């Protein structure tokens, strides 16, 4: 296993600076980024005291005897203020010692003073994601070199997520070729790992909250509150920001899920939610966007939610607000998603379909809708 540990140049550079003149090295990334094994590999040969926060026997050392580096895994589980203060005191008091802290969460507020003072370096997902050279090196080490086109496909599928790449590499040991079937198998292996290592560890309200936000590429507190019906939506988003690294900023007061985690959540939603329940969530999102007069996103939600009457209503309203050929081109996919009987019930929609058919050089279809409109 150790031979497959890749130390990226940026991680090595940060580690060397930390050992030379830093005090704290903080790893902040979701599960599957190899934080623990990377830290252990970097610290090989050092006198390390390893602890895991949240364990029943967890206790900080009383002094600096018998260790040069204090390694604490799962730091987000250190929730008691006396422990937090004690760790800060150790960092301040023992300037000659080093502290390596691993967490699936963000840097907690009680440690930020060390970051602002230049005493703490942070290795986040950007520093730990693998690139083409890393992927090439991994496959070469295990004796299954791959071509550039396969590396491109692996990078596209995994976005450089270390666990995803490692699972694909493992499945290709023995000469199995890269294929869509292999990728599907690897996705399922990673998803089952996520389910056990991450998802099932959340409380039920958080799990439900995550699933109901999964269909939306980005969201704010208001959308989260509307689609989940949870009055504590803002509090839950704050908890997720602090205790996980699954949320990414997507603008002012806007969030999105880390891409691989969102894909997992959609997979989990398909398993746990009925079609009716999934449509309900999407249509709530459609209502949110409709109230914001963001008709493009509202139409997308209502279409996926199968609410044809709302799609019809918004297409008519949008055509009134934006008359002209551009409207029809932009909204074509929503017109074509409607059943013919829904279109035939609205003169405005029949006119729109006639125009769309003409734009597509489907003159027979255009004439058919024009004749239906005239009757």
Give the role of each language-model region.
Residues 62-83:
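Conserved P-loop NTPase "ATPase switch" module shared by AAA+ and STAND
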């Amino acid at each position: 296993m150790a031979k497959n540990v890749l130390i990226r140049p940026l991680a090595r550079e940060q580690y060397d600076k930390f050992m030379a003149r830093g005090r704290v090295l903080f790893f902040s990334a979701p599960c599957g980024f190899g934080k623990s094994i990377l830290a252990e590999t970097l610290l090989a040969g050092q006198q390390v005291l390893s602890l895991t926060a949240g364990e029943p026997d967890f206790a900080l050392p009383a002094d600096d005897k018998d260790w040069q580096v204090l390694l604490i895994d799962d730091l987000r589980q250190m929730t008691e203020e006396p422990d937090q203060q004690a760790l800060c005191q150790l960092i301040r008091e023992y300037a000659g010692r080093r502290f390596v802290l691993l967490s699936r969460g963000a840097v907690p507020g009680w440690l930020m003073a060390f970051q602002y003072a230049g005493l703490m370096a942070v290795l986040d997902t950007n520093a730990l994601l693998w690139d083409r050279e890393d992927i090439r090196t991994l496959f070469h080490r295990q004796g299954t070199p791959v071509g550039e086109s396969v590396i491109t496909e692996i990078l596209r599928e995994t976005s450089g997520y270390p666990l995803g790449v490692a699972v694909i590499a493992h499945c290709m040991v023995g000469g199995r070729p890269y294929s869509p079937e292999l990728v599907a198998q690897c996705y399922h292996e990673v998803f089952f790992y996520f389910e056990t290592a991450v998802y099932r560890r959340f409380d039920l309200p958080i799990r439900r909250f995550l699933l109901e936000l999964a269909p939306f590429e980005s969201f704010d507190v208001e959308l989260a509150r509307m689609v989940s019906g949870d009055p504590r939506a803002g509090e839950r988003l704050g908890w997720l920001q602090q205790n996980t690294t699954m949320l990414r900023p997507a603008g002012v007061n806007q969030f999105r899920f880390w891409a691989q985690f969102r894909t997992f959540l959609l997979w989990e939603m398909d398993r746990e939610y009925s079609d009716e329940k999934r449509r309900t969530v999407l249509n709530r999102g459609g209502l949110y966007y409709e109230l914001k007069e963001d008709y493009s996103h509202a139409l997308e939600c209502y279409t996926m939610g199968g609410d044809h009457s709302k799609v019809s209503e918004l297409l008519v309203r949008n055509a009134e607000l934006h008359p002209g050929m551009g409207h029809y081109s932009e909204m074509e996919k929503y017109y074509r998603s409607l059943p013919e009987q829904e279109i035939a019930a609205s003169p405005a929609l029949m006119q729109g379909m006639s125009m769309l058919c003409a734009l597509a050089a489907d003159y027979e279809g255009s004439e058919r809708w024009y004749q239906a409109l005239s009757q």
